[in-house]
Amino acid sequence: MSLETGIKAKLHTRYPLSSIMIYNGSTVLHYLLGGAGIIIGYNFSSWAGYLFGALYLVFSFVEMYIIMPLTVCPHCVYYKTENSLCVSGLNVVSKRIAREGNPKSFSKRAEGLLCFNNMYIAALIIPIIAILPALIVNFSIPLLVIFVALIALMVFRFFVIFTKIACLHCRAKYICPQAGQMGVREL
């Protein structure tokens, strides 16, 4: 599955359950740890930690599990492909809550400052940025452990999930802006 061997990566019409579990498990864990980190990091205020932690959790879960299936998934090739299952499994959700879109519009998900790709990345980065000052002001070992875990999850997502599990085998990789940036189109 590399350029050295000349073998192309297998494109999945139905991702294996293990890939879906790894993708969603790491996503949910990232969001939950991020919310917990914000709550713990800002617990010096009786309300700030809970408010900002809850806002982050709502933002991240709504962005990934409601907005994406409503706005991005209908334009994906997995929406139209019979009996398909993408790496997040959200094409199945999308088919139940959204009308079919235009696959030619799929690449637009990465256009503009507040595009869906940027919101997805923001949901991953926000807790890391928010926890940094909290570590200085309100240091604790549990907060440091959460911070390190979030960094590890981010590295795992970009260097293992995207490049080896998700994007490498995705049928949309030839039109997806993310796949192009990661260099997995030719693999």
Where are these regions (language model features)?
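Cytosolic-side membrane-entry/anchor segment at the start of a transmembrane helix
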Residues: M1-I39
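Hydrophobic alpha-helical membrane-embedded segments
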Residues: W47-E82, L153-F162
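Cys/His-coordinated zinc-binding microdomains
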Residues: V77-K80, V87-L90, R171-Y174, G180
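Short membrane-interface loop/juxtamembrane segments of multi-pass integral membrane proteins
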Residues: S84-C115, G183
